[in-house]
Swiss-Prot record:
Organismal lineage: Eukaryota, Metazoa, Ecdysozoa, Arthropoda, Chelicerata
Keywords, ordered alphabetically: Calcium channel impairing toxin, Disulfide bond, Ion channel impairing toxin, Ryanodine-sensitive calcium-release channel impairing toxin, Secreted, Signal, Toxin
Additional detail: May reach its physiological target by traversing membranes, which may be by slow permeation. Alternatively, scorpion venoms are known to contain amphipathic helical peptides that form pores in the cell membrane, and it is possible that these pores would allow Phi-liotoxin-Lw1a to enter the cell.
Species, as recorded: Hormurus waigiensis
Function recorded in the entry: Affects the activity of both ryanodine-sensitive calcium-release channels RyR1 and RyR2 with high potency. At lower concentrations the toxin increases full openings of the RyRs, and at higher concentrations it inhibits full openings and induce openings to subconductance levels and reduces the number of full conductance openings. The different actions may be attributed to the toxins binding at different sites on the RyRs, with binding at a high-affinity site mediating the increase in full openings and the induction of subconductance states evoked upon binding to a lower-affinity site.
Name the record gives this protein: Phi-liotoxin-Lw1a
Length: 75
């Protein structure tokens, strides 16, 4: 076998390994992917979403994004 043949076979073997491992990696990611509900944790009950005219607990106010925020802190 000459050098070019050895290099070609080595690259082919690497490509096969990458393809096989890549498929397993995708399935692992899909199994362990977080859903939207798992990622969106509320800060606390005081800072929950508010749909107007629902009122927030004092001193919090409902902002444009419909979230109860402290007007003194701005968040």
């Amino acid at each position: 076998m000459n050098f070019a043949t050895k290099v070609s076979l080595l690259l082919l073997a690497i490509a096969v390994i990458v393809i096989v491992e890549g498929g397993e990696g995708d399935s692992w990611f899909e199994e362990h992917e977080e859903s939207d509900t798992e990622r969106d944790f509320p800060l606390s009950k005081e800072y929950e979403s508010c749909v107007r005219p629902r009122k927030c607990k004092p001193p919090l106010k409902c902002n444009k994004a419909q979230i109860c925020v402290d007007p003194n802190k701005g968040w």
